[in-house]
A protein has these predicted regions:
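Structural preference for solvent-exposed beta-strand-turn elements
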Residues: 1-366
């Protein structure tokens, strides 16, 4: 069984699907990529059992399939190939004793590799999409990257709402119970509210600046440009009602400089003991914290005046300000000491929300 492909195209395709593979898996085949030649196409697949990456390139020759053994090493070798890549698959033995051996030849270079049987590879789920929409992959990824900090890593005990990217109408958002971040795009809207894990969406960068079709099945999401297909499981839960967490009215509004604010928070973080939770007391530009009965202070310039004293987690506020890195000013909207703190910037479609921390009475400075 023989087939011929363009070496560069094959190498690039193998690199793409390898991003879905597990580096160390209890099931060895999940560390490897499936290659299938059929109908003049070479289809490559990589999966970790949760996410599938599949792509195809033109091919000539017979129809056959195999699973790479030591995919990572094969991918390194393929990057050195140029021109026509010839792949030959030989079988030996029968039944449980059946073995595959793969020969790759390109120019004066050749290599013989063991291969797994394709029957050992997990089949991707069959989708019956009920809804679909089109979006630019690069634009969507940029929006996700701005807000994904407001998620937590998934564990068995973590609420799915806190680990996921939420899609609802023309908004995407994240929240972890202590903060939230969202972005609005009036040019498109999700046909139904849904949630996805954050990790698979990092693969959107493989599509570059292309428009992609997003297909929504009851349990899965498929994102494709017609050649590359990203398939992963949906989070089977109802997205959180973000509007219920956003204050509708604000008593005060001040402008801060993100760079200056982050620098002063970084100063306090470096000065205070590192094994403590950093609870910051903020009022009219004055920033104070107290750790182990020691008091630390600094201040920033405000455009506007604030009389509401609020408390917040230092790291959460730094993450929210980082969302607006590069902006000269950010508006901070306040309602009360116990209401969420809203951050936004002029001509930006994204927002951040930080939940306050209840403040204890602080002794007067010596």
């Amino acid at each position: 069984m023989r087939a011929v492909v363009d070496a560069k195209e094959f190498s690039q395709a193998l690199d793409k699907v390898s991003r879905a593979l597990r580096k160390s898996a209890c099931i060895p085949v999940l560390e490897e990529a499936l290659v299938r030649f059929t109908g003049g196409r070479c289809i490559l697949t990589g999966t970790d059992f949760e996410t599938w990456l599949m792509t195809e390139i033109p091919a000539q020759g017979d129809d056959f399939a195999f699973v790479f053994h030591r995919t990572a090493d094969a991918a390194k070798a393929c990057r050195r190939f140029d021109g026509e890549l010839h792949l030959e698959l030989a079988e030996s033995g029968e039944g449980r004793n059946k073995e595959l051996r793969l020969l790759m030849r390109c120019g004066h270079r050749a290599g013989e590799l063991h291969a797994f049987l394709p029957e050992e590879y997990p089949e991707p789920p069959t989708l019956e999409p009920k809804h679909s929409f089109t979006v630019n992959a690069a634009s969507l990824l940029e929006r996700i990257n701005r807000i994904k900090y407001a998620t937590v890593k998934p564990t068995e005990k973590t609420n799915a709402c806190c680990t996921s990217i939420h899609f609802s109408g023309n908004r995407i958002y994240c929240l972890d119970g202590l903060r939230a971040a969202w972005d609005t795009d009036e040019s498109w809207a999700a046909p139904i509210p849904f949630m996805t894990p954050a990790a698979p969406l990092a693969h959107l960068k493989l599509f570059g600046n292309k428009d992609v079709s997003v297909l929504l099945d009851k349990r899965y999401v498929s994102i494709t440009d017609g050649t590359l297909n990203l398939l992963f499981r949906r989070v089977e839960a109802v997205p959180f009602d973000l509007d219920s967490a956003i204050p509708r009215q604000f008593r005060e509004e001040v402008c801060v400089q993100p760079k200056e604010f982050m620098a002063e928070l970084a100063y306090l973080k470096e000065l205070a003991p590192s094994n403590q939770k950093y609870v910051i007391r903020f009022c009219n530009g004055r920033i104070t914290t107290q750790v182990d009965e020691c008091r630390y202070e600094t201040e920033i310039h405000l455009d506007g005046k604030s009389e509401i004293e609020i408390g917040f987690n230092l790291c959460h506020m730094m993450d929210a300000l980082q969302q607006f890195k590069g902006e000269s000013h950010v508006r901070m909207k306040l309602t009360s000491p116990i209401s969420p703190i809203l951050l936004e910037a002029e001509d930006r479609s994204d927002h951040a929300l930080v939940l306050p921390v209840r403040l204890k009475r602080m002794p007067a400075a010596a």
